[in-house]
Amino acid sequence: MDNRGHFSSNGNFPPQGYHRREQSQEGMRIGNHHGPFSSGNMRSIGGSAQNQQQRHWTNMLNGSNNVENSWVCFSGNTSLADDPNVLSNFSALAQQRVNHFDTIVQERDNRNASFLNGSAVGNNLNTSFSVFGNLRGGDQDHRVLSDHTGIYTGLGSTGQNAVGTGIRLAADVANGNFLEQRAPTAMGHNQSYSALNQSLAPTLLDQYNQALLDQYNQSSQMAQGRGYPAPNIAYGLQNAGFPAPQIAHRPNTQNADPQAMNMNNRLRDHTFQMPHTNAQVPMSSLPGLFNLSMNHGSGNQQFQMNQSSSGPAPQLPNLSESFQMAQGSSQVTMSSRPAHSNTSMNHSSRNQYNHVDQRPSRPAPHLPTLTKEEEAFLETPDFEQFGRQLYNYLLPGILPNGAADTFSDAPKHQLLKLAKTLKPMLYDYWRKTMQMQNRGANINIIQWIIDFNAKFAALNSSVAKASNSSDVLNQTLPTAAEVSDVAREDASTSQPSKSRSMYIRPAASLDNTLETLDENLDSSQSHAGPVPAASTKPKTPSFEKMIRYSGIKKRSTMDMDNFVRMLDEKINFSPEPSTSSDIASSVKGYMSQSFLHQQDDEAPDCTKNVHSESDLKQAEPQESDKQSDKELPSNE
């Protein structure tokens, strides 16, 4: 009869008793090393000799017999031939016990059982057990009910529950090896349980091993050939999932269970374990996880894989590899950083160890959250001008990232645009600076920048007027009103004005840094006429000076060092290769002086004064600004 119906109907998980026995087995292993261990989950046939049995196994494991690497399995060879309801190789009771207790011990009722000699003895109460069908010289186990103890579950090497037996031996009685009295039970024919008032034999397994080894020498040699422990017959448990060698010369093969006696084992088992001398391949039935360990060849070569179905797909780096062939152990190390890639492989007969160390590359910069109006404003010339001034104020001498841009209407003027990731960062930095300066007030930063550009342009225009020269910046600036109007129009439409197409030109004639751009605005604006020849030509007001006059204290509201470090880590400063050397030289000092300008065909006359007196008055700093400027320590 095919007894593979051990597991539940879905074929995936065993019944509850399976788990309880497995937990009990773990407990026994603890007890083997730390003394007797009791577990209420251990089950014998009668269910009443749990503690006794565990002490029995504990004593054995502390002795010379390593049960944890042994298979001791028992099977019967009789049948109830006159029972029309049962097949010829199993009794109904045995089949029920196999499925319920994970055993392959067959129980026979001597009233109906047939033996090797074809005779039947006993009566209804003479229930006995067969261990491979016979003991010592082919004699059948004919002892009566009173000579038997229970058959116990639990043997450590299979990962499941093997069976023990408790047949009373004369040597045990004479030597006083019986432990405490218990009342195990054994099944009789057509009976659920019947009591047995007998003791347990602690040395039973050793004596059985010797008897079976003598009787089945050939089978024992087969066991050694397959790597099984030599002291025990290599007979695989059906529920353990590992192969068992053929044992067919002594038992009654005509009536023996072919499913348990040959190499064909259960197909739906979930474990596969072998002794430590062979390869161990533990696999979990969970769909997303598995561990695989294989022993192959004389040199121990291990591959351990941990796979999770919930994790993301691996990102494979595109790297150059260097291979080193060497004898002995070696390591394979991989990194996703292009500058530190080292791969070494070993193709020797020794141990091979593979290690993969993958570090993520630089994270993408965290861009602030902006409104649509703010995003549109970042693309206008107003913010381009202010962003360049602010960038150079924070990082003087470092050009922002971007490709060279060639304007169709002015091919000689090329400039580096602010990167798209740099604009939001600069805007957010200045927005936070203004909020901190004004104690969290919600300020219209867009309007502030537009007004700032207009005021800055008016101040530069007043300096040019005072010096009676428009060549201060080598360009003519529009009025403050024009700057504000164009910037507001661009911000509202997010498109450059068609009538006033603005762009930024580099101040090629200026070679000034932030440190040399400071001036005394009071003295420069007090001159209404041409500057005397003996006087020094006034300098252009610096962005830093304008910031201070706007009420922002230098490096007093934000941690500049952290912001600079953030820019350095998250922005890749690498201009396009097409940027020529003359452009690089022309932008020297350019970050501090970039202004809006009209197209060449709309440029006003450079000799005319395009600024009104009201513009100049509006551009002049107030008394409060002058006073606050005097209070600030100069760190120029």
From Swiss-Prot:
<comment type="subunit">
    <text>Interacts with pptr-1, pptr-2 and pgl-1.</text>
</comment>
<dbReference type="GO" id="GO:0036093">
    <property type="term" value="P:germ cell proliferation"/>
</dbReference>
<feature type="region of interest" description="Disordered">
    <location>
        <begin position="484"/>
        <end position="504"/>
    </location>
</feature>
<feature type="region of interest" description="Disordered">
    <location>
        <begin position="521"/>
        <end position="542"/>
    </location>
</feature>
<protein>
    <recommendedName>
        <fullName>Protein meg-1</fullName>
    </recommendedName>
</protein>
<dbReference type="GO" id="GO:0043186">
    <property type="term" value="C:P granule"/>
</dbReference>
<dbReference type="GO" id="GO:0048609">
    <property type="term" value="P:multicellular organismal reproductive process"/>
</dbReference>
<feature type="compositionally biased region" description="Basic and acidic residues">
    <location>
        <begin position="608"/>
        <end position="636"/>
    </location>
</feature>
<feature type="region of interest" description="Disordered">
    <location>
        <begin position="289"/>
        <end position="367"/>
    </location>
</feature>
<feature type="region of interest" description="Disordered">
    <location>
        <begin position="1"/>
        <end position="54"/>
    </location>
</feature>
<comment type="function">
    <text>P granule component, which acts redundantly with P granule component meg-2 to promote P granule segregation during embryogenesis, and germ cell proliferation and differentiation in larval stages. In its phosphorylated form, and together with meg-2, promotes the disassembly of zygotic P granules in the anterior cytoplasm of pre-gastrulation embryos. In its dephosphorylated form, and together with meg-2, promotes the assembly and accumulation of zygotic P granules in the posterior cytoplasm of pre-gastrulation embryos.</text>
</comment>
<feature type="modified residue" description="Phosphoserine; by mbk-2">
    <location>
        <position position="574"/>
    </location>
</feature>
<feature type="compositionally biased region" description="Polar residues">
    <location>
        <begin position="1"/>
        <end position="13"/>
    </location>
</feature>
<dbReference type="GO" id="GO:0022414">
    <property type="term" value="P:reproductive process"/>
</dbReference>
<keyword id="KW-0597">Phosphoprotein</keyword>
<feature type="compositionally biased region" description="Polar residues">
    <location>
        <begin position="292"/>
        <end position="355"/>
    </location>
</feature>
<dbReference type="GO" id="GO:1903864">
    <property type="term" value="P:P granule disassembly"/>
</dbReference>
<feature type="compositionally biased region" description="Polar residues">
    <location>
        <begin position="38"/>
        <end position="54"/>
    </location>
</feature>
<feature type="region of interest" description="Disordered">
    <location>
        <begin position="591"/>
        <end position="636"/>
    </location>
</feature>
<keyword id="KW-0217">Developmental protein</keyword>
